[in-house]
Amino acid sequence: MKLMLGLLLLPLTLVHASPATPEPCELDQDEESVRCYCNFSDPQPNWSSAFLCAGAEDVEFYGGGRSLEYLLKRVDTEANLGQYTDIIRSLPLKRLTVRSARVPTQILFGTLRVLGYSGLRELTLENLEVTGTALSPLLDATGPDLNTLSLRNVSWATTDTWLAELQQWLKPGLKVLSIAQAHSLNFSCKQVGVFPALATLDLSDNPELGEKGLISALCPHKFPTLQVLALRNAGMETTSGVCSALAAARVPLQALDLSHNSLRDTAGTPSCDWPSQLNSLNLSFTGLEHVPKGLPAKLSVLDLSYNRLDRKPRPEELPEVGSLSLTGNPFLHSESQSEAYNSGVVIATALSPGSAGLSGTLALLLGHRLFV
């Protein structure tokens, strides 16, 4: 995007606004970092204001829903960056957020090429419409070495190949991938490459995904190091259906978040083999009336809070669970919440003050101490 390319000091001719146009970019500094926020929703914004962000570690651009297609005539996305690479490397940029714009694929991927020379570690794209088809990367092209990539309400013209195309512009060290409100998660698995370092995948807030969609999204053998999977509000209906999808994907999962799904009874369904290392499961806010059958054998952390349980789980139902959260279930109203559970299981009946605002993924990573 022109505003991003401008930030990275590319040799572009920027559109200059009149002197009366207010500056769209502002700096905010504290003891920890320098942040820069730019609002380019004005009909004729001063794009050159983006240079103000050159000294910031945390940068956010808001496009106001405008289309950036006109920039295709002004920006050479394949320009030689040789004399600018050292300048780009010197920028302190670590986190970048881009919101609300209509962006041609060539501009987006050209920007990722520029960011490949920066120290960017976290990228968030939100409320974007990515238009047009993608070109193959140049032989010497490489994208940023991201640790975290977050996509929310991003639509792509290439509905089933967008992940594979985006993946070509990222270095292979991505550890956390979040995709929310996606328009398509039906990936072309033959084209998707392996994510060799991905440890956390968050597909929450995709209510149309469902268990069949999960099978399509979790391309087999593409996530060999996946440890945490978050599926909050993702249209899941049964724990057995999720188990089948995980078995097909062959992921070494350790923590699974199924909270905020309407789960139903799976009694009588065929047994399923969960990932052998799965030991943490979040089933809060799922409407359960009793403990589901066929839970992971090595489950040690279980969140059943804010369901419809009318009794305590029996010890034989959860033989390996050492940390159990039951906050907000009906049976607690008729019992003393301080009553000891004679099986020795540690029961959490209230959330810690600091945990309420944490994401489900982070809560799972922290194990039994925090739950959403």
From Swiss-Prot:
One MF term in the entry's GO annotations: lipoteichoic acid binding
Database matches in InterPro entries: Leu-rich_rpt, LRR_dom_sf, Monocyte_diff_Ag_CD14
GO biological process per UniProt: cell surface pattern recognition receptor signaling pathway; cellular response to diacyl bacterial lipopeptide; cellular response to lipopolysaccharide; cellular response to lipoteichoic acid; cellular response to triacyl bacterial lipopeptide; inflammatory response; innate immune response; positive regulation of cytokine production
GO cellular component: cell surface; external side of plasma membrane; extracellular space; Golgi apparatus; lipopolysaccharide receptor complex; membrane raft
Subunit organization: Belongs to the lipopolysaccharide (LPS) receptor, a multi-protein complex containing at least CD14, LY96 and TLR4. Interacts with LPS-bound LPB. Interacts with LPAR1. Interacts with the TLR2:TLR6 or TLR2:TLR1 heterodimers; upon interaction with ligands such as diacylated lipopeptides and triacylated lipopeptides, respectively. Interacts with MYO18A. Interacts with FSTL1.
Job description of the protein: Coreceptor for bacterial lipopolysaccharide. In concert with LBP, binds to monomeric lipopolysaccharide and delivers it to the LY96/TLR4 complex, thereby mediating the innate immune response to bacterial lipopolysaccharide (LPS). Acts via MyD88, TIRAP and TRAF6, leading to NF-kappa-B activation, cytokine secretion and the inflammatory response.
UniProt comment concerning the protein's domains: The C-terminal leucine-rich repeat (LRR) region is required for responses to smooth LPS.
Protein name as catalogued: Monocyte differentiation antigen CD14
